């Protein structure tokens, strides 16, 4: 795509964003429900486009796990529409006053929620990101420019087309939801430098994509990190509970960022627990990559490498390490994790509190699966991503995280002395 064409997308989105700022909550919710209905009504078009993407994925030898991230079904399309409807039911943050006070000069000062403006989103395989991002940006008063990966090109394109058609039918600018129809690296890099039109850029995808955006972009970036998530089984853990949590965190959907990638286990329960968890994971054909002590206990495992401790597998692979203490577990996590989601399984209150306080991550759990780090599960509705940085937003990013604030000041003739 030519730079001039990309700038035109940006200009159109910027101008359209001002019209969105004039809509009240009722109008936005009505339009969101229209979009949801359009997605459901056009399921055959979506499935047809998705079939093209799946065919190309198979031709290029993409793994079945990654194809699952790409695949759409009637049920998943319905879930996408329901996600849009849920966003319509959420409280609108725009116009909310976070705080208000009167200063010594008699000025009434309020801090009010406002849209960020135009949001650019660069993302990979999962087509549901398209509808999640579009609906969240729309409800929070932002225009959006979407640039998906080549794997889901046809799916993303038809989804945006359907959303734009729904807006056009209601005499609303389709430029509120823009689509970059060029998946080349050069166009992506141009988008990352579109400072005149983009207010923020949000990458969603693997480590390489996020690293590229962070090192290339001149537009401000909100980092949605990869998920090298850990579960630590303490010496005071309920082992039956631990088994259920680990199987859920690893096997329910291994291709997502909140799936567990490494299991740490206290040495005092390793011999009792590792055979049990090996048997449970074997039903899902999970490959175990273990340290020396775990290898001595497992029946079938391969030696873990240094790279395994820092890898987000997104597959039926689990790295396993036996640790001497809670302190060693925390040190390992803080060294190798991606600041996403970490969990301890323990009935020891003091061990649990130490873990929750000392582990550096967007979400830390006690006796629960890391799979709950999700906008829906947190009650935010659809999410734009899981932020693993500490500035602006951290954790699942819902509507409030897609806003900024401005100060609104009421006076009565005051002049500063």
Swiss-Prot record:
Q: Which SUPFAM superfamilies does the UniProt record give?
A: ALDH-like
Q: Does the keyword Signal apply?
A: no
- Which EC number(s) are documented for this chain? 1.2.1.41
- The protein here is known as Gamma-glutamyl phosphate reductase
Q: What is its main location?
A: cytoplasm
Q: What InterPro entries does the record tag this protein with?
A: Ald_DH/histidinol_DH (IPR016161), Ald_DH_C (IPR016163), Ald_DH_N (IPR016162), Aldehyde_DH_dom (IPR015590), G-glutamylP_reductase_CS (IPR020593), Glu-5-SA_DH (IPR012134), GPR_dom (IPR000965)
Q: In which pathway does it act?
A: Amino-acid biosynthesis; L-proline biosynthesis; L-glutamate 5-semialdehyde from L-glutamate: step 2/2
The record's family statement is: Belongs to the gamma-glutamyl phosphate reductase family.
Q: Name one GO cellular component term.
A: cytoplasm
Gene Ontology annotations of biological process type: L-proline biosynthetic process
Q: Which GO terms describe its molecular function?
A: glutamate-5-semialdehyde dehydrogenase activity; NADP binding
**Record's keyword terms, sorted:** Amino-acid biosynthesis, Cytoplasm, NADP, Oxidoreductase, Proline biosynthesis
Enzyme type, top EC level: oxidoreductase
Among NCBIfam families, the record links this protein to: PRK00197.1, proA
Organism of origin: Enterococcus faecalis (strain ATCC 700802 / V583)
Entry function: Catalyzes the NADPH-dependent reduction of L-glutamate 5-phosphate into L-glutamate 5-semialdehyde and phosphate. The product spontaneously undergoes cyclization to form 1-pyrroline-5-carboxylate.
Catalysed reaction(s) here are:
L-glutamate 5-semialdehyde + phosphate + NADP(+) = L-glutamyl 5-phosphate + NADPH + H(+)
Location within or outside the cell? Cytoplasm
